[in-house]
Regions:
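Membrane helical hairpin/interfacial module
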Residues: 51-82
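A short acidic (Asp/Glu
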Residues: 41-49, 75-82, 131-134, 189, ...
Length: 290
């Protein structure tokens, strides 16, 4: 297992820990889809089922459907059957495998699972536009897409975040998270920065022209966010703290909560000003370049 793959699996698990209890509040149940274009990461799929098993008490009267789509899914399906038998998962947690090309088969597989009327999270590896469109049919809909670096994918959801995971050898994978709900994006960012360090794996913002590498930390280095906030203020003019928190959440790899920490340092340095000049740095405070 490569260090980047290990970090990706932990990111998935940490996000599922947040997504699953919320999704299971839906009276219509929920769907988790795992799709791949080449070969599946069996460890990641097993880890997902183990997370779901931890919430077995919340499955009474609700369903959680796991849909596997891609070439040669039989071995993975058998492995997950074994895991379910080991954990004695309830019948409300079901696994369905569909063999074939991901983009060709995922739309029909999700329709058959009733994914369009309930929470849907799709974990996709190297998926194309058809798969992303299908993943956008849930209510709410979320996708965690892993792909090669380069052109940024454009899922149909309105809230999107991109981050590259870079190994010590320079090998990198692009992770794109997209959702229809703001709380989902916040939960993803929290999971992103809570991942344990993996043998030199670091993050990189694909939209950062300087390509700075960031150590994974609950208190990430603020330098790139500082530059991005200053550039945004220079181009957009004065903005409220709420506006800047939203910018951080949707246009950087950082969490919204990191915004206030950076703004406080900029105010102390005299780089920016605030209106009103005193008091708590609340959401309605207006920030401008000095």
């Amino acid at each position: 297992m490569s260090a980047v793959a290990g970090a990706l699996r932990e990111l998935l698990v940490r996000y599922l820990d947040a997504w699953t209890p919320v999704a299971l509040h839906s009276a219509r149940g929920a769907t988790f889809a795992y799709g791949w274009s080449d070969s599946p990461d069996e460890h990641a799929a097993e880890a997902a089922v183990r997370v779901f098993a931890e919430f077995a008490d919340r499955l009474r009267g609700r369903r959680l459907t796991v849909v596997l789509v891609g070439p040669a899914p039989a071995t993975l399906a058998r492995r997950l059957d074994t895991v379910q038998a080991e954990l004695r998962t309830p019948p409300e947690l079901s696994v369905h495998a569909v063999e074939g090309d991901l983009d060709a088969r995922l739309p029909a597989a999700l329709k058959a699972a009733g994914a369009a009327v309930a929470p849907l999270l799709a974990f996709l590896d190297s998926a194309g536009p058809a798969s992303l469109a299908a993943a956008g049919t849930g209510k709410p809909a979320e996708v965690l897409l892993v792909s090669g670096t380069g052109q940024l994918p454009t899922p149909p959801m309105p809230l999107t975040a991109h981050v590259e995971l870079v190994g010590g050898d320079g090998a990198a994978r692009l992770v794109t998270f997209a959702t229809t709900v703001g709380k989902g994006l916040e939960a993803f960012k929290n999971a992103l920065w809570a991942v344990d360090e993996y043998a030199g794996v670091r993050y990189r913002d694909p939209r950062d022209p300087e390509g700075h590498l960031l150590d994974i930390s609950l208190s990430p280095h603020p330098g790139p966010l500082r530059r991005e906030l200053l550039a945004h203020l220079a181009s957009a003019g004065p903005r409220t703290v709420t506006d800047l928190r939203q910018f951080t959440l949707t246009h950087t790899v950082y969490r919204a909560a990191d915004t206030v920490r950076v703004l406080s340092a900029l105010l102390t340095a005299g780089t920016v000003t605030r209106d009103p000049e005193r008091g708590r740095l609340g959401g309605d405070v207006v920030i401008a370049l000095s």
